[in-house]
Each structure stands twice: as structure tokens, then as C-alpha cells.
Amino acid sequence: MGTVSSRRLWWPLPLLLLLLLGPPGARAQEDDDGDYEELVLALRSEEDGPADALQHGATATFHRCAKDPWRLPGTYVVVLKDSDAHRSQPERTARRLQAQAARRGYLIKLLHVFHHLLPGFLVKMSRDLLELALRLPHVDYIEEDSSVFAQSIPWNLERITPARYRADEYQPPNGGSLVEVYLLDTSIQSSHREIEGRVMVTDFESVPEEDGTRFHRQASKCDSHGTHLAGVVSGRDAGVAKGASLRSLHVLNCQGKGTVSSALIGLEFIRKSQLVQPVGPLVVLLPLAGGYSRVLNAACRRLAGAGVVLVAAAGNFRDDACLYSPASAPEVITVGATNAQDQPLTLGTLGTNFGRCVDLFAPGEDIIGASSDCSTCFVSRSGTSQAAAHVAGIAAMMLSAEPELTLAELRQRLIHFSAKDVINEAWFPEDQRVLTPNLVATLPPSTHGAGWQLFCRTVWSAHSGPTRMATAMARCAPDEELLSCSSFSRSGKRRGERIEAQGGRRVCLAPNAFGGEGVYAVARCCLLPQANCSVHTAPPAGAGMGTRAHCHQQGHVLTGCSSHWEMKDLGTHKPPVLKPRGQPDQCMGHSGASTHASCCYAPGLECKVKEHGLPAPQEQVTVACEEGWTLTGCSALPGTSHVLGAYAVDDTCVVRSRDVSTTGSTSEEAVAAVAICCRSRHLA
């Protein structure tokens, strides 16, 4: 998008007065028609300066895309504070901005007002007015618009079918007919035989001009990205959920390019449609990616809070998915791509994104689907867009079988039933391997009967950073229960972890240590209806004694252990036995550390502790839960100062230590992994 000119405008005084003080009746008529473009005059200030200068004296914050080529300066999303979000406040704030800018003589164009998704508005104005806008009392933050891109450059149907259920043809448990899927993409050729009668092309269109031309090409001349994805989701022959209906929103131009603001307006269109005519379960497919966007992530959070399932492409940049939106939004199910050998998708020098913001992977290479070249044509395409379309189709089938599933329940089921440990992790950067889930999506063996299964997943925090007071924080989804907390540092310099309540929710905190390079907090998040959980803490016991913490309340069981300390190095500590005979399960900690027992009561819940230790230090020690049991807690017994941390991988507890060849460890510094395994007695 181009910006409105910011040069000084010298207009004759009579004409200026006529524009600003023209007949009120005429202006009211223009407003009623909805075609009146809000143009206000202003006075030039200075040339664009550094973004940091915008914060001087302002109460709001300014955000822009970290990737300069994707920025669209001159167009801004202004987001208001929720506490001030009266329905008329966005218009009032926009007009106040225009009135104040009028004294400075610029042109400001009001492009859109948000009501149904988040309180705010979209404006086109000079960057010189940003500081003025940031000072407005109701403004929370302002984000510069930026570009988003399509992420696309029948083995796939076989791959998503569990091996023991594979037949000569793809036979899904249902067609997903009770679910409506919204697709934000390019235009779609709805007359293609693969999707004819299954796609409704809405009248929504918000696309930027194509690069190098001022004219939009006809829909039939587009690159068929939207048509292909519609076929992957619900095509008659090559589709995943063959009975799902689709609604198409046109937010990407024929070059596969859109904007954050267009995606926002599209999401608000969906929310408004949901309010006007509530229907059954909704899935929104977001096969696009742009730079990290606070406002786009916030919009996804709002829509997910309204019960909508959002599935997004991780991105095709062979990079950390947390650097992109909407892939980085925690409320979005983010999907990476694999090939026919279950290996990460490679696209020349690029490939699938990865990291802690990815939930799982799905087929994304050489996917056969509908082509807009003709009504019977097919084409092969690759990318994380195709992978996300597979998961959207699987989600549609799961929601058709169980329409009351929440987002948290759906995500946990997708993770639980995925094929595990099939991806070659060596493809990922070394620092991302432990963070990236080794999961490839498959259909559940049955879309019913999982009601009593205990589902858990591992959630990694962002890296804390290297400062002394830096603290990493991992949190679960609102419908999940935090059952345990652990930490991990590649340097080994950390100060443990603990669970705290913040804003009415429990979070997992892990502080960095002096001289450390940063730390991760690792939360174990589970679905545990009717749970009553608490943390019991035992202070440091003193020299020569281990610290013990256990559950005090009757009926509560131990689900996790953690500990934290203030000193730089705890030193070595030879631990006693985990559970003295005749005593309940308990957490053991170093004598110099505070030890925390995470305890929960839930109907039918039972848990047990498993320990596996080695007499000499090893780089990795693991202990796994038996079939039918779910890992809820993972920790290391206090036996060595060389432990890097502990984390859960599916139902296996992993404890990592520094390379023994460089540590000078002794045989007394044993390493032990402690797993807490739980299940519902309804399944026993």
C-alpha cells in the first residue's frame, strides 16, 4: 500500500473553511451512505526518525514487522484498551485523532473500524503523526501494517491414516459434514468438480494491489493457491474431510500476497458472521505467514476465545516459527510440513519452519489437489499451507464426531494420536531440536471413546535471555491444568523452577543463574476436568539433609516435583531413597533448595512415581511410563551439579547432563530421572 502524501498543503482559506465547515446535512448524507472517506488536513512535522523516538512521552507502544521488506509504512492498526472499549470508542478516538491532526494539516484516511474482534481502527496516515496517536488516552498500542504471504511452493492421505488401519483406499471415519471451514486465501474456482457444491465464495474481499501493476487480475488467472487448498481440505477425490463445507474469504492477491490488516478484517468478518448466525463447530484455516504481529496474534486469541479453532501454516522460511504470525499465536494450532518419508520439507534453500511454536507436522510435499486451470485439472503443490490444510481436515472430522470439543481438547487429541519420533531431528538447527515436536499428524483410530483418556502435552517457554534477573515463563491454555514444572539450560547454569499464580492462572517460572546463557521453563499441561490442584513447598532443610515435600490433603496425589534455589551452585548431593517404605510419594530436593510438590485431586485419578538412575554421569537418562499411563511430571533427583535440566517428550522423562568428558565428574555424582505417571481408574 502507498502512503498518503505528507507534504505541506497550502489551500486558499475560503476553500479550507468550506471543506471543514461545509453543510452538516451534506456530510451526514455522505456518512450514511458509508462511502465518505475520512480525509483530514495536517501540518508536516519532520522526516521519519528511529522507532524508539516514538516512545518519548507516549503511554502506548508502537510495533512494526522485524523484516523490513515486509513493512507497509503509512498504514496502521490502532488498538484500544479493553477497559475503555465502549462500542462507540473506536469511532470517537479516530475522530479525536483526526481533529488534533487537522491543526497540523495532514490527510488521514480512516479505512476500517473494528467492533467484533478487538476495539480499534485502521488508518492511513503519515508516520509523523504516530507520536500524536500514541498519546491518545484510550490507545493501548499501534502496529504498522505488514505483508503476509501464501505458504505454498496421494501419499498424503495414506500417511495420515494410522498404519494398522490402512486399506487399499482412504477411508476416514466420517466426512466432517457437521463442520464449516473458513479459508483465508486467494480467490477460488468454485466450479471445479473436486469442490463444486462444497465451497461458498463469500463477498468478502480485501487484497492489496499486485506488485508491478495497478490492476487486479481476474480470479481465474490467479495461481490457484486457494483452489488447491480447498481441494485438500474437502475435495471429492483428494480431500481429507470430504464432507466439510468451506467458506472462502479473499485476502491474498494473485501473487499470493496480502496484509496483516486484510487478515484482521477477514477474521472480524468471521466473528461477525458467527454472532449474526451461530452455527456448529468452526475451523479457520490460515495458510499464510508474515512477520511477528502482536495485533494479529491478539485477534486470533479473541476468535479462539469465542470457540473457533484456528489452524495456521508454520511458514516456509526454514526458521523459528515463533518469529512469524499467525504461527506464533499460542491459541493457534501451528503446523509444519513433512515429505513422503516423514522428513522435514525442504524447498531449495528454504523449508518448513520449526521450533516450540509448532504443534505438529503434516504432509506438505507434492500434494495433489484441484487446479484452477480447468474444472477437472489437478496440480501438485508443496508447503506448510498444504500441511495446515490436512490438519484442518482432520480437525473437521474430529469435531463432527465430538462437536463439543474445546480447542484445548482438540489440540491434545491431535498431539496424542500423532505418529511419534519419525522425523530426523538432525535437519533442524541444534538449538531447536529439543524444542521442536517430533510429531506427524494422523487420524485417531476412532473419533469416539477417548473421554476418559488423560491427555498431556509439553509447553516450552521462550528463552529467558542471559541477564541475571531474567526469568522464563511457560503457561498452559485456559482449559488445561498445569501439573508440573521443570527447566532446562544448555549451559547448566540455572536456579531451578517453581509454579506460581499470576492473574488467576498458574504458570511455570524458571530463573536464569549468574553467568548463565539463559534458561527455558517447561510446563506439563494436561486435561483434567474437575481438578483441584495446589503446590506444597518445603524450605531448604540445611546441610547434610535432603528436602522433602509431599501432598498434605487427603485424596490428593502427587503429579509433579520441582525445586529452586538462590545460590550460584548447589554442589553435589547424594540423595536418599525416593520414598521410604510405608510413606506416600514425595519430592526429594537438595538440602539448599526449596522443594515443591504439585498435588491434585480429580475423580478417578491415580499416580505413581518411577525412577531410573545410573551410577555414573551420562549425557542423557530417561524413564518412561507404561502403556495406559500418562507422564504428568518429569524431574531430576539432586545427585549432581552437572544436570542441564529435565523435560517431557510424550510419555518419557528426559534428564540431560553436560558432556562427562569435560566435567570431571565422580562416580558419586549419579544422575537419576524421576517420572510421575498418572491415569484414570475408569480405564484401568
UniProtKB/Swiss-Prot annotation:
The record marks Q151, S152, R217, Q218 as: Cleavage. Its proteolytic activity is autoinhibited by the non-covalent binding of the propeptide to the catalytic domain. Inhibited by EGTA. The modification Phosphoserine is found at S45. Residues 1-28 form the signal peptide. GO terms for molecular function: apolipoprotein binding; low-density lipoprotein particle binding; serine-type endopeptidase activity; very-low-density lipoprotein particle binding. Residues 451-684 are annotated as: C-terminal domain. Keywords: Apoptosis, Autocatalytic cleavage, Calcium, Cholesterol metabolism, Cytoplasm, Disulfide bond, Endoplasmic reticulum, Endosome, Glycoprotein, Golgi apparatus, Hydrolase, Lipid metabolism, Lysosome, Phosphoprotein, Protease, Secreted, Serine protease, Signal, Steroid metabolism, Sterol metabolism, Sulfation, Zymogen. Monomer. Can self-associate to form dimers and higher multimers which may have increased LDLR degrading activity. The precursor protein but not the mature protein may form multimers. Interacts with APOB, VLDLR, LRP8/APOER2 and BACE1. The full-length immature form (pro-PCSK9) interacts with SCNN1A, SCNN1B and SCNN1G. The pro-PCSK9 form (via C-terminal domain) interacts with LDLR. Interacts (via the C-terminal domain) with ANXA2 (via repeat Annexin 1); the interaction inhibits the degradation of LDLR. This is Proprotein convertase subtilisin/kexin type 9. It comes from Plecturocebus moloch. The lineage of its organism: Eukaryota, Metazoa, Chordata, Craniata, Vertebrata. The gene is PCSK9.
